[in-house]
UniProtKB/Swiss-Prot annotation:
GO terms for cellular component: extracellular region. It is found in: Secreted. Its main location: secreted. Expressed by the venom gland. The keyword Signal applies. It comes from the Eukaryota. Contains 2 disulfide bonds. Disulfide bonds join C66-C83. Residues 1-18 form the signal peptide. This is Venom CUB domain-containing protein 1. Residues 19-121 form the CUB domain. Belongs to the venom CUB family. It comes from Platymeris rhadamanthus.
Amino acid sequence: MKLLGVLITIYCIASTLAIDVNVPSNGMADLNPVVNDGKSETEWTITTSANCHILLSCAVKGEESCDDVSIVTKDGDKERKLCPMATNSFTVQDFINEKVYVKIMTTGKDYKASCKAYSITNPKQPNQA
């Protein structure tokens, strides 16, 4: 029985991956999830420079439900979820914060989802030097 508990713990750890990504000013990072035969989640904490904001471009391919594949983004207290529809889903999200959380969940190799994170320099305001 003790061995079964160890195996379950190892499986749970192996199916979730957390990654910290620092996108340099005016840079870009690909967010491609680790995909297994079963359910897997890849989580990113994306940060950028103080004078920048983050722009995400995400896509979910397929006609499955949110139970099969999804992308969740969190910017402060605001959370959004992108799921497949009758056709492929695509979204672009612009975040004010310098830190964004992204999680991609898949339940098999047939489900496709990915994002690109861009760091955009904030434009100077008219009263700034």
